[in-house]
């Protein structure tokens, strides 16, 4: 697999997840696996949060937002990535937003649907989930990273274009850059290399913000994307 990343991006990603206190072995227990839901103009979305065991009083942990690919949900994505095991060992929280099958029959994030605004509506719901987790859990808001697979990777990149100041790092695994599609048909074309880049809606604050480092992971024999 080809990994397209600079050394500085990799170092920045590791730094954003590094605990502020000395790392210690996690106490016995598997941690907490908690459900949640947010509602907004684009409807409602469920999510899951993993919290490692033994969080001390006043301790703040980094947060990693994980966006699944098509046909997945929080449970299957957590199981396939084993991110909760890593979070327990390295001591950080994990947020898994879930796409609703009523919003997309294949369970894909609608990152491409910028023409009708569905992409931006879903991005807003994911940010609501991030904000809710920050309120209810001991999150270090200065150390939040986001990662996604396939459609989740594209949505992660879209989210960062709208809120670059909220994230310390972004990881795209087998995704398509946002702005290369505006409908289901053009998204399918973009997956096979037929891409016409168009400007994305953003805000002056986003344009002036410091952009987080990007790590791109993509197989050179990928026949899907």
Regions found by a protein language model. Give the residues of each.
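A domain-start/cap signature at the N-terminus of enzymes
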Residues: 1-63, 75-81, 89, 93, ...
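Structural cue for short, hydrophobic secondary-structure segments
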Residues: 66-69, 96
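Serine-hydrolase catalytic-loop signature spanning alpha/beta hydrolases and amidase-signature enzymes
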Residues: 71-73
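Cap/lid segment of the alpha/beta-hydrolase catalytic domain
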Residues: 98-121
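Alpha/beta-hydrolase active-site loop
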Residues: 115-137, 158
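Primarily recognizes the serine-hydrolase "nucleophile elbow" in alpha/beta-hydrolase
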Residues: 134-136, 141-206
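Short, proline-enriched alpha-helix->beta-strand connector loops that line the catalytic pocket
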Residues: 208-214
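Short beta-strand/loop motif that positions the catalytic acidic residue
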Residues: 216-218, 222
């Amino acid at each position: 697999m080809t990994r397209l990343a600079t050394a500085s991006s990799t170092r920045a990603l590791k730094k954003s997840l590094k605990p502020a206190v000395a790392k210690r072995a996690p106490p016995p227990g598997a941690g907490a696996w908690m459900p949640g839901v947010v509602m907004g103009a684009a409807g409602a979305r469920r999510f899951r949060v993993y919290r490692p065991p033994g969080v001390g009083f006043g301790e703040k942990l980094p947060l990693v937002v994980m966006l699944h690919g098509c046909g997945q949900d929080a449970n299957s994505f957590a199981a396939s990535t084993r991110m909760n095991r890593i979070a327990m060992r390295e001591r950080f929280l994990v947020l898994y937003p879930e796409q609703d099958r009523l919003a997309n029959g294949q369970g894909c994030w609608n990152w491409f649907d910028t023409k009708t605004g569905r992409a931006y509506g879903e991005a807003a719901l994911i940010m609501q989930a991030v904000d809710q987790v920050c309120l209810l859990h001991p999150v270090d808001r200065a150390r939040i990273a986001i990662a996604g697979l396939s459609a989740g990777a594209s949505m992660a990149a879209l989210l960062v274009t709208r809120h670059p100041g909220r994230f310390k790092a972004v990881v795209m695994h087998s995704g398509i850059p946002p702005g290369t599609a505006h409908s289901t048909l053009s998204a399918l074309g973009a997956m096979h290399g037929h891409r016409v880049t168009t400007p994305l809606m953003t805000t002056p604050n986003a344009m002036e913000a410091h952009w987080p480092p990007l790590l791109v992971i993509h197989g050179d024999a990928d026949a899907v994307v």
